Design a protein with these regions (language model features):
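Conserved active-site tyrosine of GNAT-family acetyltransferases
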Residues: 91
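Conserved acetyl-CoA-binding loop-helix of GNAT-fold acetyltransferases
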Residues: 51, 57-70
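Conserved beta-strand in the GNAT
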Residues: 28-37, 43-45
Length: 114
């Protein structure tokens, strides 16, 4: 599988002040995740990763989260929580060895909840 372009970022359509990381394949969005980074607190959050069913299990989500971590360097990665029961294994797998481990963490005072 080869993506049309490298990872793309745009303002999140769901959360004010957040960004959305997207991967496109053949003109179709196949992966997206909302994220927010606070450079002051060195904290980051990701929310609502989504991979179209046809490509689930192909490593797109893992690759997208890795690209974000590589881009933002030394920050601790979290989520706001509320994961679906079926997603727990995913978060454990992608959080292994990651500062913060994508564990639940409230937003810092510098970040608008959107």
């Amino acid at each position: 599988m080869e993506l049309d372009t490298p990872w793309q970022d745009a303002p999140s359509p769901l959360r004010s002040g957040w960004r959305e990381r997207v991967a496109n394949l053949d003109g179709e969005c196949v992966f997206s995740v909302d994220y927010r980074v606070c450079s002051q607190c060195r904290l980051a959050w990701v929310e609502e990763p989504y991979t179209v069913p046809e490509y689930q299990g192909c490593g797109l989500a893992s690759a997208g989260l890795t690209a974000l971590r590589d881009e933002y360097g030394d920050v601790s990665w979290h989520t706001l929580g509320g994961h679906l029961r079926d997603a727990k294994a995913f978060w454990i797998a992608v959080g292994s060895g990651v500062p913060g481990g994508y564990q639940k963490h409230e937003l810092c005072p510098h970040v608008d909840p959107g």
